From Swiss-Prot:
Pfam families: CAP. This is Scoloptoxin SSD558. Contains 3 disulfide bonds. Residues 1-23 form the signal peptide. Belongs to the CRISP family. Venom allergen 5-like subfamily. GO terms for cellular component: extracellular region. InterPro entries: Allrgn_V5/Tpx1_CS, CAP_dom, CAP_sf, CRISP-related, V5_allergen-like. The keyword Lipoprotein does not apply. Keywords: Disulfide bond, Secreted, Signal. It is found in: Secreted.
Amino acid sequence: MNILLPSTLFVLLMFQIIGSGMGCDMKVRGLDANMKKMILDLHNKKRQIVANGQQSGQPSAANMKELHWNDEIAANAQRSAETCVFEHTAKSLRKTTKYSYLGENIYKGSYPDPIPRSVNAWYDEVKDVTPAVVKSFSSGGPMIGHYTQMVWANTEALDCGLVTASDRNSYLFCQYGPGGNYRSQPIYKQGPPASDCKNGKSSKYPGLCN
């Protein structure tokens, strides 16, 4: 029979409280269907702009995939959001049965529109991305990793988790499978839009691949 000392029991209870998503007083928890659609559309439209060469300073993409929502990843992201801690999820926890590594973008803010505000903020890092970085990713310099994960060509799955706490701060965690931002690898293949699609072209977002 194992006996827990009072201090050990206290730590265990605190772990259970925080780990179960009770680390803060949540007023809003999770995403409804419209919010999921908004996040997915915003991401795919940004990817489409880049793939079609419509983003100033960025080459067009031959192999950028359309993103699809993945509920298994979404459960991971929601658990992370419910900690109400503005820190990246440990890499050991960012994986699913299909993806051994998930990329992650996170946001914290007290504005009433966290979804468009966060996605636009991540995308705005494009101003510091050069064609040389597109050809061979490197992170030494201005912060660009949120943008580059958003447009990483081989990423095909997206999910997000959302919490709004009683202090009006929203925590949005988005995870991407497979994750990107690998040093010295291309963000995407430069070339005519959707000219190197392995499984056909997207019908919903011309310029992206299936």
